[in-house]
Amino acid sequence: MERISELPDFKPTLSLTIAEAVLDAAFLYENVESEVALEALSKIVFAAQGCTARAWGRCLRAAPSAGATYPLRTYVVARAVRGLEPGVYSYQSPAPLKHALRRVEGVSVSSRGSFTILFEEVSERTTGVYGERGYMYIREEVGHAAQGALLEASALGLAGRLRKLEPPLGRIRYCVEIGARGAKLIERRPPKGFAEPSPAKLTLEEAIVHRRSVRKYSPTPLRLDELSSILLWSISGPVRPYQPLTSYRVTCYLAVRNIKGLDPGVYRYSPEEHELENIVKGDVSARLAAAALGQEWVARAPLNIVLCTPSDSPDAELEAGMVGQNIYLSATSLGLGTVAVGAFYDDDVASVLRVDERPLYIFPVGRP
């Protein structure tokens, strides 16, 4: 007989914004095993993989998925959760804002912290559609889900860390460990940079629920303060607003078409200084769209954020997903829209940007 533990429906109750969550991020603290509330577990796992709405006969989840293939199965290992028996559970979210845990009998998993979220990669769901490139999409999706969980843990005042399992546990390569906060290990002091940020219009939890992939944008230009906000909350600082796996591997470029106060062109973004360096003059959006298989939203967006890496490491792809989740939630928080674009000719994108790096993602950004 199945043992199902219903979780509280997800409701946006916290007042913190993504700007506040990344300032006091979960990964900055020592992770201490201490009893946490079931409500906290419920919110954190929802922010990773919960059903936020239904469309086209399926659930839309808190983390985006290439072609809505949803290759992840999510498990929770409970160690010290008030109101939940210790053990391994399968996470289920079959309807908007509703979710539950199903006990997995006869399985024992070593974990740290108060509870751990495991992401199993059912790769054939995505590679069956996209071939070998699907493996990159899966790692990016794990990054989105992991960062969603860590952001919610930050808002709840808990500690959390992403961990790579070596060796992997079957098809589980990455996990997120959540616990109470111990000593603060790192300080985050975001740089001032090129412009003051714009305030968020939504709380973090509201943004999690309302996040969608947006492909149609108005012709209204973006503002510098909006651009500053997205970059500050997504990738800025000597200590960035997400946890690295040993080192930072992702670089950031902007293809600007229509931002008030910023000439069209390609800009290299410096996370450490929060500054922009113009490396190509003139609007390249049409060429970038051609490199992205003719996706018109790339051509029409006032801004395209392009994430690249000089590394061959698969961990760079996971990191791109973490940055990407920040970009999605930052844009949503500002009343803007974006979509993760992973289908493009790598060499052509690099040529448009004039960089000798491997492109990982394109994020067109605009007003819905």
Regions found by a protein language model. Name each.
Residues 1-113, 159-160, 168-170, 182-301:
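N-terminal amphipathic, basic helical "cap/leader" segment at the start of enzyme domains
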Residues 44, 74, 115-167, 230, ...:
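Small-aliphatic-rich amphipathic alpha-helix that forms the alpha element of a beta-alpha
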Residues 168-189, 353-368:
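A glycine-rich helix N-cap at a beta->alpha junction
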